[in-house]
Structure formats: structure tokens, C-alpha cells
Amino acid sequence: MLICRLIVTIATWLSAYVRGALSSRFILGVIGPLTNGSFAVGAWLAVTHLPTLYDVRRTWVSSLASARYNPAGYAYLGTVFLIVPLLLVPLPGYLSGCFRASAIRRAGFFLLWFGIVGLFLLGVETTIFPNPGRTRFSHQLFTTIAFIGITPGFLAFSLLAWRRAWIARTSLVPAALACAVLLLPGIGA
């Protein structure tokens, strides 16, 4: 009886997690820091295992995740690409629940899911099938899917937040900052 209740409780929580039916406190206090921390730790581990001294002026960021020149960094960042999409799973549902129904909300929802799936597939491809040779088409495809989905998906929700702030005559700085931060990965790619 206790095991059945435990299973039902876990299943209920996982269902709420996937639907994004979580509190703002959990999303902002747990998911956000874990996602950012995962990227930071993965990048730090990749830099510390780079065989040469990392100099941002002379070394490409992609060399941190090179299976040929930095296999340990490649493995660490591949693991991050497995963890981060799992952490991002509740965001499309949560963010959709923050705004009224519209075409941009639906587009943001689907783009964000598309990017999360692409990032997870990139993590699987990088971690399970490391390639010290030339870059495979699948790697380029999953990277493109992740960028095409995540950046515009977050941008759509940032624009909705900006619009809401504009209509309510509140500060536009948080929404504008979110838009700027979320455009950087797309510009860098």
C-alpha cells in the first residue's frame, strides 16, 4: 500500500513537471539556478581539461568541446547537453500558462519544445557516440535544431512579457534584458 502511494505521488509530480504545472518559486528557485549552474560547471570542467591554456582571444569556444583536442571537455559538455534539456522540460508549459492564448504563445511553446528535443538529441549523440574525426551531419543537425528552437522560443515568450509590460505601463527593462540575453546564442551561432 505504501509503495503504491509512493508510485502515485511520483507519477503525479512527474506529470506536473512535464506539463509545467509547477510553482514560480520552484521554476525560478530550482530550475533556473540548476540550468545555469549546469552550463557553468560543464564549461568550467571543459576549460580545466583543455590541454593548452585557454585564451579567449586566441582559442575558439568550439575547441572546448572538441572530441579530438579535448575529449574530456567533450564528454562533460555532452553530459550537460543531456541534463539541461531535462531541466528545461517544464518551461514550455509553465511559460504558456503565464500568457493568454495567441499565435505567438503557441509558436513559442512549439519552438521551445523543438529546441529542447534537439538539445537532448545533441547530448545523446555527443555522449553516447563520440566522434574524434570530422563533424558528423547529425551533430550539425541537432545543434541547428536546438538553436532554431530554443532561441526563438524564449524570444517569443520574452516578447510577450515585453508586450504585457508595455500595456501595463510597467518597467520594460526585465523583458528587454531577457530578449537581449536570449538573442546572444543565436547571434553567436
Residue spans for each PLM region:
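Short, Lys/Arg-rich, polar N-terminal cytosolic tail immediately upstream
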Residues: 1-22
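Hydrophobic cores of alpha-helical transmembrane segments in multi-pass inner/ER membrane proteins
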Residues: 5, 80-90, 146-157
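N-terminal signal-anchor transmembrane alpha helix
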Residues: 23-49
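Hydrophobic transmembrane helix segments
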Residues: 44-67, 122-128
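Interfacial helix-start motif at the membrane-water boundary
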Residues: 64-85
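Membrane-interface helix-boundary motifs at transmembrane edges
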Residues: 94-107, 160-171
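Membrane-proximal helix-loop-helix units in multi-pass membrane proteins
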Residues: 115-162
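Terminal transmembrane helical module of multi-pass membrane proteins
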Residues: 157-189
